[in-house]
């Protein structure tokens, strides 16, 4: 016998935990990183690498030599 989501057990005691909501299972595996975040991270890494190469061409020193000359 069910009434408004409650169920009576064999001893006619009210068991309001008898009807559980269905469990939703997501089949896609994610570790917290979204596709958008991965694209942005890759783009910023490319910008940083290209600017590092440009600085090396302009100054004639690498990043370590430039930092040591400060």
From Swiss-Prot:
Residues 59-70 are lumenal, thylakoid. It is a single-pass membrane protein. Belongs to the Hlip family. Forms heterodimers with HliC, these are associated with photosystem II (PSII) assembly intermediates containing CP47 (psbB) but not CP43 (psbC). Other studies detect it in PSII complexes with CP43. Associates with PSII assembly intermediates close to CP47 and PsbH probably on the periphery of PSII; requires PsbH to bind to PSII. Cofractionates in an approximately 100 kDa fraction the thylakoid membrane with HliA. Coiled coil: none annotated. The chain crosses the membrane at residues 31-58. This is High light-inducible protein HliB. GO terms for cellular component: photosystem II; plasma membrane-derived thylakoid membrane; thylakoid membrane. The gene is hliB. GO terms for biological process: energy quenching; photosystem II assembly. Residues 1-30 are cytoplasmic. A motif (Chlorophyll-binding motif) lies at residues 38-43. Keywords: Membrane, Photosynthesis, Photosystem II, Pigment, Stress response, Thylakoid, Transmembrane, Transmembrane helix. InterPro entries: Chloroa_b-bind (IPR022796). It is found in: Cellular thylakoid membrane. It comes from the Bacteria. Induction: Transcription strongly induced in the absence of photosystem I (PSI). Increased translation in the absence of PSI (at protein level). Expressed at very low levels during growth under normal light (40 umol photons/m(2)/s), induced under high light (500 umol photons/m(2)/s for 6 hours) with maximal expression by 1 hour and decreasing after, after growth at 4 degrees Celsius for 6 hours and less induced after nitrogen or sulfur deprivation (at protein level). Upon return to normal light protein levels drop rapidly. Involved in photosystem II (PSII) assembly and/or repair under high light stress; probably important for quick stress responses. HliB-HliC heterodimers associate with PSII assembly intermediates with CP47 (psbB) and bind chlorophyll and carotenoids in a 1:0.6 ratio. They probably protect against photo-oxidation during assembly. Complex binds mostly beta-carotenoid, but minor amounts of echinenone and beta-crytoxanthin are also detected. The complex efficiently quenches chlorophyll fluorescence, contributing to photoprotection. Disruption phenotype: No visible growth effect of the single mutant; double hliA-hliB deletions are out-competed by wild-type in high light (500 umol photons/m(2)/s). Quadruple hliA-hliB-hliC-hliD deletions die rapidly in high light but grow normally in normal light (40 umol photons/m(2)/s). Quadruple mutants are sensitive to norflurazon. In a quintuple hliA-hliB-hliC-hliD-hemH deletion chlorophyll half-life decreases 2-fold while the half-life of PSII proteins does not change; photosystem II assembly intermediate RC47(1) is missing (RC47(1) is PSII monomer without CP43). De novo chlorophyll synthesis is very slow. One of its GO terms (molecular function) is pigment binding.
């Amino acid at each position: 016998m069910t009434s408004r989501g409650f169920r009576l057990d064999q001893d006619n005691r009210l068991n309001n935990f008898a009807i559980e909501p269905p469990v939703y299972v997501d089949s896609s595996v994610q570790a917290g990183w979204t596709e958008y975040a991965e694209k942005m991270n890759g783009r910023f890494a490319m910008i940083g690498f290209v600017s590092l190469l440009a600085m090396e061409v302009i100054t004639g020193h690498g990043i370590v030599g430039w930092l040591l000359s400060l």
